[in-house]
Amino acid sequence: MASLNENQKFWARVTELARQSIGKQAYDFFIEPAQLMSVEQDTANILLDSGMKKDYWKKQSDLITTAGFEVFGRMIDYELYANDELTDIELRRLNNQSPVDEPLSVAKPTSPLVSGLNEKYNFENFVQGPGNRWTLAAAIAVADKPGDTYNPLFIYGGAGLGKTHLMHAIGNQILTDNPTARIKYVSSENFVNDYVNATRKNQMESFENTYRNLDLLLLDDVQFFSDKEGTKNEFFNTFNALYDKGSQIVLTSDRIPQELNNLEDRLVSRFSWGLTTDITAPDYETRMAILLIKSESSHLEFPSETLSYIAGQIDSNVRELEGALNRVEFVARANGISIVDIETASQALRSLKNATQQSLSNLTIKKIQDEVANYYHISFSDLVGPKRPKEIAFPRQIAMYLVRELLGTSLPAIGTAFGGRDHTTVMYAYKQISDKMKNDMDVQKDIDSIKRKF
Ligand code: ADP
Ligand code: MG
């Protein structure tokens, strides 16, 4: 619970914002007589002098949200009470400021075990896209029938693409359905630390009690698992114990099981008993949807062209995408801007862009053409020549797309660089590949792999 001081600050800010945004008469009538009784959990309890003023206050959520973020740094909701409508219980509760005596809401059930779960990550706030569709479906299936459908579930993919998010979502869902479920989320590093501590302190029994009696083990980033013999052995035994009693195991990694050199084959082969599924980078639509959701909790206004601009800047990592949005928000706030325009966004992201441009500054059309030809095993002369079979025309379109995308070269100039083609041909190629980038995973992967070479 927040200290009184913070509550006062919060309320002062609410009234100040109100004074700035509404007329004096309305302020004196609706705002002035209101009192902040308490802030419990993330809810501000506000007492009005009359029930008829509730409707007006219901429309003032901006004041509360803004002040809440400024003072508490998080989303604050609010509950309205009116002097002329209060029951005795409510009045007592508000005056005592004691949520303990008369809890308004039933306490959330918690697992008897320290689960390590983060409630923030759930299925509802996970945006589905072509890059994560199957993995999301598998995760939902696992949460629905743990230990049944896909066991273990092995999720792999690059950094910041939602692997950890999905793990927590599975755990939270299972915990909601079954509040007594024994669940543990742990990074591989912490599993190793727990084990090392247990052996050092002679507490192996308690370690095994914890880990081998779980209903669900979520083990994150197994590529960081230590390759020490003892730990690996313990992991192997834990895995077997859990698997044998039908407990669900979910693992993540940045690579496929076969590439995990830190783990033994006998363990890696067990990973494939269940389902191995990957997450790839979000396409443009998914990035937009993620930005839309994340920007909703901001009290600034993000027009869609601004979000589109941000989505165009960061294309391979959701964590960075969130970081970019935060950065833009920060700069907008610092400049007192409430409707965030592209100009502000581009200013905020300039330093980010500089970093990527640095690595692209040596890039030339020729280099892109060479890499593409190389990637698809065709010759440079075919790539820019007149031949038109699919095996050549497709890489050519990819190369044109990349030149346009990465170098911003004009359409006619690209046409020239590709054997003197017309600019409409280039435009067509660009459109073809842009469309495919939205829903064709193979094309996304190709482009990703080629880009990584630069
Ligand atoms: P990973 O474990 O794959 O490195 P995380 O699960 O930590 O990635 O995701 C990084 C951030 O991006 C988190 O804040 C997560 O909530 C967010 N995120 C990733 N994918 C999505 C998605 N599809 N929808 C919403 N948020 C996402
Ligand atoms: Mg992670």
Swiss-Prot record:
Subunit structure: Oligomerizes as a right-handed, spiral filament on DNA at oriC.
UniProt keyword annotation of Nucleotide-binding present: yes
Subcellular location: Cytoplasm
Protein function: Plays an essential role in the initiation and regulation of chromosomal replication. ATP-DnaA binds to the origin of replication (oriC) to initiate formation of the DNA replication initiation complex once per cell cycle. Binds the DnaA box (a 9 base pair repeat at the origin) and separates the double-stranded (ds)DNA. Forms a right-handed helical filament on oriC DNA; dsDNA binds to the exterior of the filament while single-stranded (ss)DNA is stabiized in the filament's interior.
Segments of this protein annotated with the region Domain II: 77-115
HAMAP family: DnaA_bact (MF_00377)
Amino acids binding ATP: 160, 162-164
Annotated stretches, region: Domain I, interacts with DnaA modulators: 1-77
Family affiliation: Belongs to the DnaA family.
Keyword RNA-binding assigned: no
Record region (Domain IV, binds dsDNA): 333-454
Organism: Lactococcus lactis subsp. cremoris (strain MG1363)
Protein name: Chromosomal replication initiator protein DnaA
Written domain comment of the UniProt record: Domain I is involved in oligomerization and binding regulators, domain II is flexibile and of varying length in different bacteria, domain III forms the AAA+ region, while domain IV binds dsDNA.
Annotated stretches, region: Domain III, AAA+ region: 116-332
Alphabetized UniProt keyword annotations: ATP-binding, Cytoplasm, DNA replication, DNA-binding, Lipid-binding, Nucleotide-binding
Annotated Gene Ontology cellular component terms: cytoplasm; plasma membrane
InterPro entries: AAA+_ATPase, Chromosome_initiator_DnaA, Chromosome_initiator_DnaA-like, Chromosome_initiator_DnaA_CS, DnaA_C, DnaA_dom, DnaA_N_sf, P-loop_NTPase
GO BP annotation list: DNA replication initiation; regulation of DNA replication
